[in-house]
């Protein structure tokens, strides 16, 4: 196996070809290539290989494949007691694919303490909107009092969901989006969400680090499973597993 390179590969707009992922840089971790394009063909080719674009506005397109990789196995989602209490109040409603562009705009504009500016440029908005129209990119919307207060978006290929970004305007709204998404994906037979880079927030929700090699082996299995691109609708009662169960009182028995 070749040693990791110290410079990223430079890509032309054609052909749509990425270098082998094991040639990605180790510093910065996972930077593989520069250039290419953000057409649906480029993006879908990238996600199939576990590669994603991430770059600042006005910079060239940067393609990444970090090692290790942050992922959330859906059965490992952590729903803490405080979040269960919030769910039980039933103050939120959740939809899928109703306001994709709005969710992306909210993700782009929300203030984050760990970054200056946004990487979700107009170029990215346009590219992922095209993927949404073709049934590959999806959004989760969280509503409270008929206002959009949280959500997330990402790309689905086969039975892998590649999470891109999330936002929250009120406490727990982005967590609600993830919980509802996991309930629906589980019902459809998905078992993994790619969360890309490790963060304390994602780790608290159950995300874990796995090797690039293991991640790519999962992709080879799961992205080829039959799940046609289409608009999504929420088909499950995502709150049901968390609602308080009625207490059944045992009847006293008396001996004759």
UniProtKB/Swiss-Prot annotation:
<dbReference type="GO" id="GO:0005737">
    <property type="term" value="C:cytoplasm"/>
</dbReference>
<dbReference type="InterPro" id="IPR016181">
    <property type="entry name" value="Acyl_CoA_acyltransferase"/>
</dbReference>
<dbReference type="InterPro" id="IPR042203">
    <property type="entry name" value="Leu/Phe-tRNA_Trfase_C"/>
</dbReference>
<comment type="similarity">
    <text>Belongs to the L/F-transferase family.</text>
</comment>
<keyword id="KW-0012">Acyltransferase</keyword>
<dbReference type="Pfam" id="PF03588">
    <property type="entry name" value="Leu_Phe_trans"/>
</dbReference>
<dbReference type="GO" id="GO:0008914">
    <property type="term" value="F:leucyl-tRNA--protein transferase activity"/>
</dbReference>
<dbReference type="GO" id="GO:0030163">
    <property type="term" value="P:protein catabolic process"/>
</dbReference>
<dbReference type="InterPro" id="IPR042221">
    <property type="entry name" value="Leu/Phe-tRNA_Trfase_N"/>
</dbReference>
<dbReference type="InterPro" id="IPR004616">
    <property type="entry name" value="Leu/Phe-tRNA_Trfase"/>
</dbReference>
<comment type="function">
    <text>Functions in the N-end rule pathway of protein degradation where it conjugates Leu, Phe and, less efficiently, Met from aminoacyl-tRNAs to the N-termini of proteins containing an N-terminal arginine or lysine.</text>
</comment>
<keyword id="KW-0963">Cytoplasm</keyword>
<keyword id="KW-0808">Transferase</keyword>
<protein>
    <recommendedName>
        <fullName>Leucyl/phenylalanyl-tRNA--protein transferase</fullName>
        <ecNumber>2.3.2.6</ecNumber>
    </recommendedName>
</protein>
């Amino acid at each position: 196996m070749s040693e990791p390179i110290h410079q990223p590969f430079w890509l032309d707009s054609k052909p749509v070809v990425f270098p082998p992922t094991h040639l990605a840089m180790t510093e910065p971790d996972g930077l593989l290539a520069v250039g290419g394009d953000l057409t649906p063909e480029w993006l879908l080719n990238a996600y199939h290989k576990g590669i994603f674009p991430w770059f600042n506005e006005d910079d060239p397109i940067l393609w990444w494949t970090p090692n290790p990789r942050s992922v959330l196995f859906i059965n490992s989602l952590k729903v803490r007691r405080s979040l269960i209490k919030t769910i039980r109040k039933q103050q939120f409603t959740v939809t899928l694919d109703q306001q994709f562009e709005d969710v992306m705009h909210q993700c782009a504009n929300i203030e984050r303490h760990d970054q200056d500016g946004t990487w979700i440029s107009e170029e990215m908005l346009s590219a992922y909107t095209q993927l949404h129209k073709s049934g590959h990119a999806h959004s989760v919307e969280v509503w409270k009092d008929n206002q959009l207060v949280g959500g997330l978006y990402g790309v689905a290929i086969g039975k892998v969901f590649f999470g891109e970004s999330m936002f929250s305007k009120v406490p727990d709204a982005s967590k609600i989006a993830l919980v509802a998404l996991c309930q629906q994906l589980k019902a459809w037979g998905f078992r993994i969400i790619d969360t890309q880079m490790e963060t304390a927030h994602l780790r608290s929700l159950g995300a874990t680090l796995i090797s690039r090699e293991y991640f790519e082996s999962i992709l080879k299995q799961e992205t080829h499973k039959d799940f046609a691109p289409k608009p999504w609708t929420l088909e499950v009662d995502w709150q049901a597993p968390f609602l308080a169960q009625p207490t059944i009182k045992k009847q006293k028995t008396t001996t004759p």
